[in-house]
Amino acid sequence: STQSSYDEPTNLLNDYTVYFVARVDKPMKSFGTWVNGYVDTTSSICWGRHDIGAFMNFDTEEGEIIQLKTAISYVSIEQARKNLEVESGGFGWNFDAVRKYAVNEWRKILSTIEIEGGTEEDKRKFYTNLYRSYCSRTIFSDVDGQYVDMYERTQQLKDPASPIYGCDAFWNTFWNLNQLWALATPDIMNKWVESLLEYYRVGGWLPNGPPGVEYCDIMGAQHEIPLMVSAYQKGIRNYDVDKAYEAVKK
């Protein structure tokens, strides 16, 4: 069974639509929705604010496990379906394979730094914080490079492997995180610079805070500029350097 829908969150002028597709490995018995406590078992569509959602019922046996996988897109339901097929199609319904893949992807990042000495607790704290230092960078483009810009237009990235990121404002990352990212993962740092230049290409300005791939009034400083300069100073320059200078100067 496959269900699809969308949501429109609004916050700090960062309005955007999230489309999603959800697929389960067993046919459902029934489907329903609820809005602020009112349950409707006859409708597959619901509108409203606050407490709103949908549910599926199944005939199950004791101990039976039902698996569900989802994908999202900020472009369309069709794009969400494409993301689901590309990102999870190779795994089928093998949960352990998906988990192993996720573990290996994070291991690639965390293993860029090896520490010596200290206790197991010290190591656990270090790698937990290293993990957290990467968590606020969120990919907003689809597997084929499509995304919705700050003017609600669908754009196409030249290289889908270098995605557009919606994230916080790189707030005070010049104190330590810029250096960490550049030294530990220069390839990821380069992608972040490319993402900022994509904002400049389609919007005309670098974003102070790009949550939801929007221009946000969250702060008045330009903390993205020290990140771009830090990348350049460390030899991370696999992007249009002249365009980067133009964007920073503007």
Description of each model-found segment:
Residues S1-Y165:
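Beta-sandwich/jelly-roll carbohydrate-recognition scaffolds of carbohydrate-active enzymes
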